[in-house]
């Protein structure tokens, strides 16, 4: 019987497609399982990272189907984004055409892997019907005040000519094209994710144990909650006139260090700095230096050498009443706190570095509880206050509270909570995205489009050159009438950040296609299917997508669309696929084409290798020889199935009548079955299950009992079906009419040991081991132990004989 993967795989893929084999039931009384791998961007070809992501999800989905669960395992396309525009420029093809052609090709590639997707619920986020509901949500958020517009310094990518969210700037560079990002001030739209900062933080506790600790820690750090003191520093009289205001707010998490303040520092974008520039109170050289700082993004600034400029302004210390110089510094960020810091160089490394560079005073006011204070560096740990007025002698923790209380009692400050998390900048100056459904009217201001006019669709007659925003340049598209007054108006020409689309796509899947024109999703569907039971994707999405999706879910809950707080119950973050120790990439020339692997070895080989080579959460090193090894195992597994016979039910086997080798073979088979439940539902260590199945097949070799072979294949095709489905469907169809594709029961007798191994010790020292029947008597055990320990007990008097059942025999001798 020859193994022909091409014929077998084509046969079953055709059958699955014809029978819509993987569509979920609309039977909401059944136990459900929602398995979702993060949907792909339709770049044109799948890569090995896709193969890994979707094979993991497919294995889990197939397992739960066999247990009788109602499984939702959908696929779709994260279809908007800059690569389509870049392709339009490079290949002179419309983004829409490029995108949908890529989707068609990639769908065939994924289907060729035998992935059990619900294609009836498939969509692309660039479909107008998807945009319609997204725009409806955006209008709701605008009306609620959750979407707003303001002028802001934003991250600008000079190459892509668009704005980037903070999360899309990686080490000072654009996350897509790697161009250095600069700062630019323009009118932008923001979603008020900060309104949900505390809930996003607190609800991370609900995910503990089900999400990787690393992802939870990354989100917690990104949200960045800190408690401290907020107070106003007032200018002296001369400085107030120059600055145009009486002072500015500062926030500190270390109020215990307030007596050590020797200067204050403002962000280059601070209103005071702006006022000095606009009123021409700074030299051209100073303005140029500040502009250079402003053009650097936050990460570049913080990593760069500390730079500053004295503004010839002074504020009054709120407690000592001393004059404190005011500087502008590149390490102060406008978006954190108030954009101003009280600098305590003695107790902050960053402030210390800056003070040393510019020869500013350093005043120590906290010392360690034990040991000497080292004044050659900043002492940043808690300690005992000194030279701090009435707060001297207190420990840092107590001093913090007392100083906050003093400020509050005297009306000069207050306890405050700050977050590093900033509002989500969602507008992009690009063509290929969801149009923002707002209209600019000269009389009425910004007005949302009427919902009955949705979706606002993109014009197709555009020329994409890479310069500016094609919607802004279009001669007619933006011209419209105001929904409020009926007068002439213009459409908003910005489009939405593509992370908006991926913030709710998992909800769309819950509702069958036939309802999509009427609703974004039905509540009865989300009540049943949500949250996603198992979500699978790369850890690179820990902050970006996963935080936004959590936020969006909470907003949609508050808008009345859903009844849940968190979208993803469990999260598995798979590792990257490497070749020659590096991440696969075209630029490195180390990619492997999945299509070629499938054509040469078959989809089941690709699936088996990808799940066997490493645990899902770890990086996977590509190995041609391991791929060949996976193929050989499947071929052997298929061809040896002829040793089993056809049956519609599991053979009845009398354990007592079997030989030792037959018992061992059964034991290996049932050990693999025992392991499978944990692997498919908790640990996802598919490599260990595959190894156990290989051991079981090896144990079956050499057996002549057809019952043992048949039972072995009944179990093994069940266990391996989620991993190598085509091969297992073919074997099971031929032998068992697929009656074994159900939840199998363990046979406890098969796992029982006939014998036990006992350690033999003489006077407590281990000398040997014996194997005895499980039900051996004490006398039989001692006889065998004495025989093997003969040379250590001969000629000596046995004083005591101890048998510890299942563990050891100890013989005590003297003489």
UniProtKB/Swiss-Prot annotation:
Keywords: Aminoacyl-tRNA synthetase, ATP-binding, Cytoplasm, Ligase, Nucleotide-binding, Protein biosynthesis
Span of the annotated motif 'HIGH' region: 40-50
EC number annotated for this UniProt entry: 6.1.1.4
InterPro entries noted in UniProt: aa-tRNA-synth_I_CS (IPR001412), aa-tRNA-synth_Ia (IPR002300), Leu-tRNA-ligase (IPR002302), Leu_tRNA-synth_edit (IPR025709), Methionyl/Leucyl_tRNA_Synth (IPR015413), Rossmann-like_a/b/a_fold (IPR014729), tRNAsynth_Ia_anticodon-bd (IPR009080), Val/Leu/Ile-tRNA-synth_edit (IPR009008)
Gene Ontology BP, a term: leucyl-tRNA aminoacylation
Motif 'KMSKS' region positions after renumbering to this chain: 583-587
Protein name (Swiss-Prot/TrEMBL): Leucine--tRNA ligase
Gene designation per UniProt: leuS
